[in-house]
């Protein structure tokens, strides 16, 4: 890369990024003008682009939406994203409106999807990666496509027939194509993909450029049984459940202009697992490239942005966190992560190799829910019973309460979500008998502060930094255990699971290089506590009859201040359940042929229960993935591009267990 007379030149492609004399004028003439006509007739516009480059097309088009109530969703794909410093140098020479804001929000250059909330009515999705691969991970219908890569002769891969075919799949009927190119190869490729091509005068003396309009069909869709729903609806949203998932979902929809109501059966928010004294915001760490781990990375980055923007600093401390690889399986996961935007692996840490999670946070879940609840309409004492369709919407019934009406119904019931699928203590419905979902009991323990640590620490159990005169450790994990009362032996299990992090070797020698205070020293605060337990003596056994633990090394004089039981929802594959609920009878009838490759129904769209969605089964990391769940539901309801690659959206789809069952030929 080099600048020639203030214009960036790419030495690999031997081409400039823009016109010499008037880069903004060129952007407006070729690309921005294509938006003007649509702006007259539409309140929502989806613009997609191949080649973000310097961002001039985005900034030019975004300026048209400034001080407007119209909504712009701009998706841009870039294989070779530029460093922020290069963008800044270019903007110094050419004053672009919004350039400073873009620089402030510009993401790291890690491949993948990056969502930027540019303003209240403008969203920018930057998709970094090879266009052919990235396009396959997209699902939306654009109003306009901007083809702004290097010239076809210098970068033929970006103008291939496969790329054009994917663009056609992502176009609504009569969508526009705008490009500076007048290449016959580009024209033919567009025509073969179903576009009507016309040539118009080019910019600044260039003879011609292409305009095209989509009149064809989208072709075959891969994994058509996961195709997104497209419902029209009113603006009344009813959410069942006032934990973190329900609260954040309500906030998201309220910010989009929907009228939201939350129905909660308890007398307060965060009555279940979201009600803990404190909790850790961090992703689940898998081996690099595993879809579950990739989903958690996206969720984590989105959650960090959300809490930093919306939550008071006293309720969210972004201090980082450390996880220790206490067995070989975890070590194998950790060592696949080099130093990156999120992780920093340290093989030599004590008592085990560790991974430091940058921007992990110590959160106050209950207080966060209470903080948001002040802005929401929440009806307490409303225990969901059932619902019936009525005039295109729903009448939802509750135990001992008057029914509520809504256009959109969202379930965010946490561990009690299993009751919607024929399970749990109080079966309410059975939307899908193939669903794999269960409730897991977890007990946390509050102690008199015993360890001075500025960050959460995790191994078999986890320790949070002290808050005031309390320090939290946790948490047990017992599937299908519905006991509400705290149990002494569970407190003892929690103590046993953190004991190895509290011996003298750990306190003196564990790595502190990632801490904000480089001189910080871990310290045992309670001198009466003997935590000097060796690795060899960590084994213990549970006496199933009397429910007590026998320790080989006694932990002495621990002051337990209290305990709390919460229940978490888990799915059978550990992915949350986020999306539209399927019409199971339709799936079973239409997709029973899935096991046989021949005669497979191509593009037979799925059918969903109209405007009924779910955001649940977030397990132990609901503080992280619940934010992603709310964003995806907003994507679905507003029919905007997804914030995640489609392959990950499919992994989260509530219909996935039913589809897997049908693929095996099971009924």
From Swiss-Prot:
Keywords: Cytoplasm, FAD, Flavoprotein, Methyltransferase, Multifunctional enzyme, Oxidoreductase, S-adenosyl-L-methionine, Transferase, tRNA processing. Pfam families: DAO, Methyltransf_30. The keyword ATP-binding does not apply. Residues 240-667 are annotated as: FAD-dependent cmnm(5)s(2)U34 oxidoreductase. It is found in: Cytoplasm. Its cofactor is FAD. It catalyses: 5-aminomethyl-2-thiouridine(34) in tRNA + S-adenosyl-L-methionine = 5-methylaminomethyl-2-thiouridine(34) in tRNA + S-adenosyl-L-homocysteine + H(+). One of its GO terms (biological process) is tRNA processing. Its EC number is 2.1.1.61, 1.5.-.-. GO terms for molecular function: oxidoreductase activity, acting on the CH-NH group of donors; tRNA (5-methylaminomethyl-2-thiouridylate)(34)-methyltransferase activity. GO terms for cellular component: cytoplasm. Residues 1-215 are annotated as: tRNA (mnm(5)s(2)U34)-methyltransferase. In the N-terminal section; belongs to the methyltransferase superfamily. tRNA (mnm(5)s(2)U34)-methyltransferase family. HAMAP family: MnmC (MF_01102). Catalyzes the last two steps in the biosynthesis of 5-methylaminomethyl-2-thiouridine (mnm(5)s(2)U) at the wobble position (U34) in tRNA. Catalyzes the FAD-dependent demodification of cmnm(5)s(2)U34 to nm(5)s(2)U34, followed by the transfer of a methyl group from S-adenosyl-L-methionine to nm(5)s(2)U34, to form mnm(5)s(2)U34. This is tRNA 5-methylaminomethyl-2-thiouridine biosynthesis bifunctional protein MnmC.
């Amino acid at each position: 890369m080099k600048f020639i007379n203030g214009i960036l030149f790419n030495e690999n492609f031997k081409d400039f990024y823009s016109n010499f004399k008037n880069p903004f004028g060129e952007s407006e003439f070729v690309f921005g003008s294509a938006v003007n006509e649509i702006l007259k007739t539409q309140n929502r516009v989806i613009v997609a682009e191949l080649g973000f480059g310097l961002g001039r097309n985005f900034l030019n088009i975004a300026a048209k939406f400034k001080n407007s109530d119209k909504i712009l969703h701009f998706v841009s794909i870039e294989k070779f994203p530029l460093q922020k410093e290069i963008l800044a140098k270019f903007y110094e020479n050419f004053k672009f409106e919004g350039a400073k804001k873009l620089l402030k929000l510009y993401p790291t250059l890690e491949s993948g999807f990056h969502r930027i909330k540019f303003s209240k009515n403008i969203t920018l999705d930057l998709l970094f990666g090879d266009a052919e691969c990235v396009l396959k991970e997209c699902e939306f219908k654009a109003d306009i496509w901007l083809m702004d890569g290097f010239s076809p002769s210098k970068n033929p891969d970006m103008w291939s027939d496969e790329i054009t075919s994917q663009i056609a799949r992502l176009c609504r009927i009569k969508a526009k194509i705008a490009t500076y190119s007048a290449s016959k190869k580009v024209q033919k490729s567009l025509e073969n993909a179903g576009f009507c091509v016309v040539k118009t005068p080019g910019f600044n003396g260039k003879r011609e450029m292409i305009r095209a309009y989509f009149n064809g069909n989208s072709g075959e869709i891969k994994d058509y049984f996961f195709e997104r729903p497209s419902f029209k609806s009113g603006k009344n949203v009813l959410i069942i459940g006032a934990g973190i998932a329900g609260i954040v979902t309500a906030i998201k929809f309220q910010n989009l202009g929907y009228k939201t109501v939350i129905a909660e059966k308890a007398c307060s928010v965060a009555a279940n697992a979201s009600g803990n004294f404190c909790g850790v915001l961090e992703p689940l760490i898998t081996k690099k490239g595993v879809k579950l781990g990739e989903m958690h990375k996206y969720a984590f980055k989105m959650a960090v942005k959300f809490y930093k923007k919306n939550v008071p600093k006293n309720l969210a401390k972004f201090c980082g966190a450390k996880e220790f690889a206490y067995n070989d399986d975890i070590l194998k996961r950790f060592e696949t992560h080099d130093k990156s935007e999120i992780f920093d692996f340290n093989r030599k840490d004590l008592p085990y190799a560790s991974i430091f999670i940058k921007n992990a946070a110590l959160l106050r879940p209950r207080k966060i829910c209470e903080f948001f609840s002040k802005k929401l309409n929440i009806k307490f004492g409303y225990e969901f019973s059932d619902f019936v369709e009525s005039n295109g919407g729903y009448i939802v019934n509750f135990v001992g309460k008057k029914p509520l009406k809504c256009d959109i119904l969202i379930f965010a019931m946490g561990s009690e979500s299993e009751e919607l699928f024929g399970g749990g203590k109080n079966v309410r419905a059975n939307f899908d008998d193939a669903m794999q979902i269960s409730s897991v009991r977890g007990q946390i323990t509050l102690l008199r502060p015993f360890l001075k640590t500025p960050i959460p620490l995790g191994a078999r159990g986890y320790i949070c930094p002290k808050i005031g005169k309390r320090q939290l450790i946790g948490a047990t994990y017992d599937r299908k255990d519905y006991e509400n009362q705290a149990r002494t032996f569970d407190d003892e299990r929690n103590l046993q699971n953190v004991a190895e992090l509290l011996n003298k070797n750990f306190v003196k020698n564990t790595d502190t290089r990632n801490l904000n205070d480089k001189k910080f020293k871990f310290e045992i605060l309670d001198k009466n506590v003997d935590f000097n337990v060796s690795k060899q003596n960590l084994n213990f056994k549970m006496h199933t009859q009397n429910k007590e633990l026998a320790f080989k090394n006694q932990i002495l004089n621990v002051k337990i201040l209290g305990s709390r039981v919460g229940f978490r929802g888990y799915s059978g594959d550990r992915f949350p359940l986020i999306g539209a609920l399927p019409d199971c009878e339709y799936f079973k009838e239409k997709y029973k042929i899935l096991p046989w490759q021949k005669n497979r129904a191509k593009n037979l769209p799925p059918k969903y229960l109209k405007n009924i969605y779910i955001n649940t089964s977030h397990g132990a990391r609901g503080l992280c993935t619940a934010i992603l769940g709310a964003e995806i539901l907003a994507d679905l309801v507003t029919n905007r591009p997804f914030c995640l690659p489609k392959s990950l959206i499919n992994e989260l789809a509530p219909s996935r267990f039913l589809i897997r069952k049908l693929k095996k030929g099971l009924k």
